[in-house]
């Protein structure tokens, strides 16, 4: 496949605690970044889902665990999205995004996580809504 890229193309996928975007959280985030020169970088984070109001780990819906194979116990020692948000934002910077079903679920879920982090006090400069 020949791609004529002028900016990096970032393919991404998430796994979550459930399908309710305002109430569920990302538990795994995977990126494959393809650069205009053809170089590729891959990154995956396992993320402890955090309830910012209750200040505790958010449980994974059992039906979500059946789909993604990730359990609460697997995430106990993982960082929260708050802790990886800066690194995630760096990966997104200056990239065009691509993914399966990304505009209906993955992108809104990612935007929700960034919004929670900003409400918790971390200042980020992430724009997932404006096409470049």
Predicted regions and their residues:
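A contiguous binding-surface segment within folded domains or other stable secondary-structure elements
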Residues: 132
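Conserved non-catalytic scaffold segment of RNase H-like nuclease domains
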Residues: 1-128
């Amino acid at each position: 496949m020949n791609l004529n890229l002028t900016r990096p193309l970032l393919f991404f996928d998430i796994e979550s605690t459930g399908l309710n975007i305002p109430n569920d959280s990302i538990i795994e985030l995977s990126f494959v970044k393809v650069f205009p020169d053809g170089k590729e970088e891959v990154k995956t984070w396992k993320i402890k889902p955090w309830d910012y109001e209750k200040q505790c780990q958010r449980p994974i819906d059992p039906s979500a665990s059946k789909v993604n194979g990730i359990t609460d116990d697997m995430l106990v020692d993982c960082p929260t999205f708050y802790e990886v948000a800066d690194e995630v934002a760096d990966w997104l910077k200056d990239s065009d995004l691509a993914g399966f079903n990304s505009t209906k679920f993955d992108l809104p879920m990612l935007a929700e996580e960034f919004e929670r982090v900003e409400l918790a006090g971390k200042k980020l400069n992430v724009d997932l809504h404006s096409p470049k």
